Amino acid sequence: MESPLIYVSVLLLNIFEFSSGIVYNKDDTEKRFACSNKGFPQENEIIKLYLFLENLKIQCFFQTENEIASKAMLSVFTSGGLAPSLGIMNSTYNGIFHFNLTLFSDRILWLVDIPRENITQSTDIAAVEEWLVRITLHHGLNIYATEGTLLDVIREPILQWTPGDVIPESEISKLYPHVVDLKVTKCPCANDVALLGFIVDTIVDGVYIGITFGGFWHDYDTTWFNMTQTIYSQLQEEYEDLSLVDMVLTNHFLVILTSLGLFVSEDLRYPSRHSLSFSRADFCGFERVDYVKGKLWYNERCFANREHFEVDYVTVTFERNRTLSESSSCFYSQEPFLEWVPCLPHIFKGIKIFPTVLTFLVDQERGTGVYLFYNKVRKTAIASVSTLRNNEPNSQSKFPIFRFPSSFSSPVGMVFHPRSHFLYAYGNQIWLSVDGGNTFQLIANFHDDIIKKTFHSFYTSAITFVSQRGKVYSTKAGMGRYSAVGSVTERIFTLYYDHLGFLHKLTLGRFEASGPPTAFGNSRNLFGQPPDMGFETALAPQHTSLDEIIFFAYVPENEPQETIYSKKFGNIHYGKVIHSGKTGRAYIRKVLQHTTPKGFLSSVIAEMKEPFGLEEVNESSCLSSSLLINKAGNVYKLTLDSQVVQALFEDTDIEKTVVLPGYSSFLITSILDNKNALAIATMPESAPNNMTFLKSTWFLYNFGQRNGRTWKIYSKPCNYWFQHDDSPSLNIVKYIDLGNSYVLKAKVIRNAKGFRMLEIPLLTVFVGNPNLLEVTAEVTFDDTDSYVITISAASKVLHQGSTSLAFIMWSASTECFVTTMVPTLKSSCSYLRSMHHIPSKFIPFEDWISGVHKDSQGFNLIKTLPINYRPPSNMGIAIPLTDNFYHADPSKPIPRNMFHMSKKTGKFKQCANVSTREECNCTKDQKFSHAVAFSDCREKVPRFKFPITQYPVSLEIINEDGRVPLQSPYLVTVTEVNMRHNWKLKHTVPENIKRMKQLVEPILGAAVYNPSGLNLSIKGSELFHFRVTVISGVTFCNLIEEFQIYVDEAPLPFPGHTLIAVATAVVLGGLIFIAFMFQLQGIHPWRTFQRWIRRNQEKFSSISLSELIHRSKSEE
């Protein structure tokens, strides 16, 4: 008893090893929370939340089988102080908010009030991801969770427009008799925002489109528009028979193909007061008969937080052969879709006989164009890939042309699964390419049926195929198996996946979803009961071990060649379950096609989960006798003991299988008489000959279909849990900058009882563009035999781009909610990545508001700038020369504006062309921004005492993973935006930095500094505004940070040097002037001085010694 307990403990520990991960496929799909932000929440409703300019207010209650039980559960939670948490997430964001208990209309509800800026600060109209919301409550060992969506209504582009005249619901129903088909398209980033269009007959003219923001869950969420006049306004002549043909909603544009031409909307991001207008694309030589057979092709990708290399492409194809006057029957364009160019390279334009282009798609991950050609004469299909150069396909193929087999005789088109690199070609077969169109793998063969439509969900990776006969098939992106899920009986319908992956069937006047919230992901009620995927033939089981069995499918000798496929196992049976009419089931692990043994052209290897029921003597009397087996040519003769009278072969024994432990099994094909029958061996090499088997040593299985098929094949229940530890989102987007790497972990946990331990990989990993990043994988089996994979991706080239990284549980059932995870890795700069200056002294935000924050000596560290302030220049404090105003107010006078040079400079930015500061519309963030672009709004700056020496310029990089100090190999340049010069930088220069400086500085023409240990000294006064820029080549990001320092209490300048200089100049000038005047008057001071000296000498020499003595005595 100890071993199971230990095992359970280890299992639990390993399950919670990824503390931040979510385990999928656990069948805990019962939805317990009902929530709404538009009135009182309704029970059993999908959670649809909407974000407007005001706060997001959400009310939730705990729903059970009745109101009394709900209140009882709430009292339990309340007494325990429990309340649910709300997770809001998309591919790059994850926020957690907590509910509070409140009372509303005698109902106990949980309430949360979230300011919009706590979710997003952006209000501009752009392609923005719809958020997923997950409401979770932990109570003991129970985890109650419910998922929903949150749509930012004010930012979604298409919702800001009125594309035509609004049609009342009562009027739209009058069009139903004239509708011949439906077309649906959805927003790439918010799949709950979708458009539904009517294709009408020639009796009714017009383009009629319905727009929903709630994923077609309710009729009242759809607004209908008549766009007829909008389209007619672009036609220069009078036309008739206008109808929608196809449409595509891209990230920023709506493209509509009608019977009278192709029309492209204006940019949806810039709404105006008028209705949405369109421009018409001109295709020379094409008429209505061509347009009604046209198709639009689009590689759906979400461009939220758009990169410069991300752009939408749309292709239009026409079902006609090119003539000498026409350049192509296939055209493509990139946004803004103003110029449509032929899909074929120029080298093919002169060729008269060339295969028809069925589809042309742009693979943005690899930068290629993928073609699907079809030769109607030879009935052959090929795929070709060309490199795009300047957005035009190269005439030379990137890979060798892939030729589909002749069995792919009716190709229809190609499609990329959204946000991935999985490429599907479909028609009477389905082919999958995981390497950009270089090679394809056969997924399904429908023979005389043709797949006409495909529908995709990026969230669950689900794909639905619909054939021209109305049969519906499903698979998961990247998987090599598929299932039949039923059929559609309506003549006019279309399918649609919403943002949470629910499948909807849209018909005239009725929208059906794939089940209530308690049946998440279940599509069976849309298409009836799950179909039996068996086929009309007999199976012959052959045991190979106690838990492994092979089923051989019988093909009669007289079976027509064209119907042999209907008697064989196919790809559809891979991963399914064989059920016996009695008891027993087995999981199909492998499908085999072969030509021997005779009569068996296919087989499956299956793992027995439950033993199959044997025939009893009362069902087959032959079991009461011994059995003699003799070979008779290509068949075997089975003979019963003639002494046992009651033992007889009967017609009901035909297609039953004789099982002999240790030998080949035999399928009975005919009865010769009561004691003799003919059979074929499943394994002739191990078949006995001229051997007798006693009673009870041989057995009979009945897997025949002569008296009604006794076996069935259904989908296998989900057999794996999937967990990843990085984000609650399945479709995360991660940015990898130059020199950086990213690690992603995932775990696959078996949940089947009695499963076999197989040391084989349970995950397959595909990289969309293997040339972009260096991707490595490390796999292990943990103590519970769960499969753990660690993926490391690192940048390796100075090239920006994106690639999808697909994790596929290849052995999982298609019934699993999650079999495929497709994160996107971008070799680029994250929009969340920025550089920040760390102030040397922290000042709380409330002190910034008040403008007072004093240090220990009473010195205020905040300076409120004068109105219309400009920093001084090198010419003096009173002569500012910068264009930047601070604390701008156009209604107030401008100080320091007396000199002509100062009057010529100085320009308002935020306050340009307004008369008061209030009209500048400065936001709170702009008022405290260090950016020079918002200097008009800046009012307060950090204040320091003179002098500033060795001020540490500390910088850090902030991204979604945290904060990292800025250090080498990042190098920076530093400038003062107001052109002040009395400052100096000091930094350490190691040998490696020294070499980089020598290489970079001549190129940049500026000094480069090491950010580690960077110090600043300032000798001037008043405001200094610095900009720090990381040099290019070491990051994809444009990392720029600005900071300001106000230097106050600077002493007056010492005048000694100036006075000495002036005195010296005056003395020298006076001497030079006197010398000039002497020269001008002819006065020679030197000569006069010399004569005076000589006269004195002569006079002194004429006096005698006695006279000198006499003079000295008289003086005494």
UniProtKB/Swiss-Prot annotation:
The chain crosses the membrane at residues 1054-1076. Coiled coil: none annotated. Its main location: membrane. Disulfide bonds join C35-C60, C189-C302, C330-C343, C718-C816, C829-C1037, C911-C920, C922-C937. GO terms for cellular component: CatSper complex; cilium; plasma membrane; sperm principal piece. Residues 1077-1116 are cytoplasmic. InterPro entries: CATSPERB, CATSPERB_2nd, CATSPERB_C, CATSPERB_head, CATSPERB_Ig-like, CATSPERB_N. The keyword Transmembrane helix applies. GO terms for biological process: cell differentiation; spermatogenesis. It is found in: Cell projection, Cilium, Flagellum membrane. PANTHER family: CATION CHANNEL SPERM-ASSOCIATED AUXILIARY SUBUNIT BETA, CATION CHANNEL SPERM-ASSOCIATED PROTEIN SUBUNIT BETA. Component of the CatSper complex or CatSpermasome composed of the core pore-forming members CATSPER1, CATSPER2, CATSPER3 and CATSPER4 as well as auxiliary members CATSPERB, CATSPERG, CATSPERD, CATSPERE, CATSPERZ, C2CD6/CATSPERT, TMEM249, TMEM262 and EFCAB9. HSPA1 may be an additional auxiliary complex member. The core complex members CATSPER1, CATSPER2, CATSPER3 and CATSPER4 form a heterotetrameric channel. This is Cation channel sperm-associated auxiliary subunit beta. It comes from Homo sapiens.
